[in-house]
């Protein structure tokens, strides 16, 4: 901006000089026409001297302005640096200003985590524990010792057998009759037997094997005991550890 201002000032000065030269030439012509030659020469020399002085003065002013512009370009104001001043790490908040209440941010499950949990469930399904079958046991007061040699001891009271007569058909009883062969004990395994709970009364959803315990003994044609009245070995449900 300063350079443009200086250029404008120089142009104005040159224009003024041209005007003055034109005026001086006109005055010289007028004087030469009116006065003798000696006076015209003196006036011309005087005018030329004044013009030279003005031109020199304007040239000096322009040089001074250019020097100041160059100095101002190189010399720029630098920020004041305090050697012992430490920067403030945080903005100082006045005490009158209260912090704004922010809404609580709740964690949410990403869809990738949900897919991983579902894949684990499909790969490693949970084991279903099979319930143990409850075998009915006759109370100790009504229990009788079963002896194949004594037919009277094998007979049980009728009120214990009546609730099971209408549940199991005779066709099932005939197909599920045990053979007359001696019952072999199952091979012993390392699994410890699970004790069966004692039920003081017979249940309706009892298996057919339990029903055979309450059946009346019947004598065959040869006078021997029917195989259904043979004692049944108690079945233990193994527990897998």
From Swiss-Prot:
Post-translational modification: There are at least five different forms found in milk, with varying degrees of phosphorylation. These include form 3-P which is phosphorylated at three sites that have not been determined, this form is present in very low amounts, form 4-P which is phosphorylated at four sites, form 5-P which is phosphorylated at five sites, form 6-P which is phosphorylated at six sites, and form 7-P which is phosphorylated at seven sites.
Residues the record lists as Deamidated asparagine modifications: 150
Xref: InterPro entries: Casein, Casein_beta, Casein_CS
Chain positions of site Not phosphorylated: 30, 32
Name of the protein described by the UniProt record: Beta-casein
Record keywords, A-Z: Milk protein, Phosphoprotein, Secreted, Signal
A Pfam family that the UniProt record links to this protein: Casein
Example of a GO biological process term: lactation
UniProt modified residues of type Phosphothreonine: 27
Signal peptide limits: 1-15
Purpose: Important role in determination of the surface properties of the casein micelles.
Sample GO molecular function, one term: cysteine-type endopeptidase inhibitor activity
PROSITE patterns associated with the record: CASEIN_ALPHA_BETA
Family according to the record: Belongs to the beta-casein family.
Main location: secreted
Phosphoserine: residues carrying this PTM: 24-25, 30, 32-33, 38-40
């Amino acid at each position: 901006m300063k350079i443009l201002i200086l250029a404008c000032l120089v142009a104005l000065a040159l224009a003024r000089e041209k005007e003055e030269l034109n005026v001086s030439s006109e005055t010289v012509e007028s004087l030469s026409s009116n006065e003798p030659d000696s006076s015209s020469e003196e006036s011309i020399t005087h005018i030329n001297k004044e013009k030279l002085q003005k031109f020199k003065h304007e040239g000096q002013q322009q040089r001074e302005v250019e020097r100041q512009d160059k100095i101002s370009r190189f010399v720029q104001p630098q920020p004041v640096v305090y050697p012992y001043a430490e920067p403030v790490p945080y903005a100082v908040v006045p005490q009158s200003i209260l912090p704004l209440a922010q809404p609580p941010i709740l964690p949410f499950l990403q869809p990738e985590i949900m897919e991983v949990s579902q894949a684990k469930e499909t790969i490693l399904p949970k084991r279903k524990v099979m319930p143990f079958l409850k075998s009915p046991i006759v109370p100790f007061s009504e229990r009788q010792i079963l002896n194949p040699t004594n037919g009277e001891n094998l007979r049980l009271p009728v009120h214990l057998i009546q609730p099971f007569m209408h549940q199991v058909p005779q066709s099932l009883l005939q197909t599920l009759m045990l053979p007359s062969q001696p019952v072999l004990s199952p091979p012993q395994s390392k699994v410890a037997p699970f004790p069966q709970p004692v039920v003081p009364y017979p249940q309706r959803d009892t298996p057919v094997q339990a029903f055979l315990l309450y059946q009346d003994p019947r004598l065959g044609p040869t006078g021997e005991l029917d195989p259904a009245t043979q004692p049944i070995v108690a079945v233990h449900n193994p527990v897998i550890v």
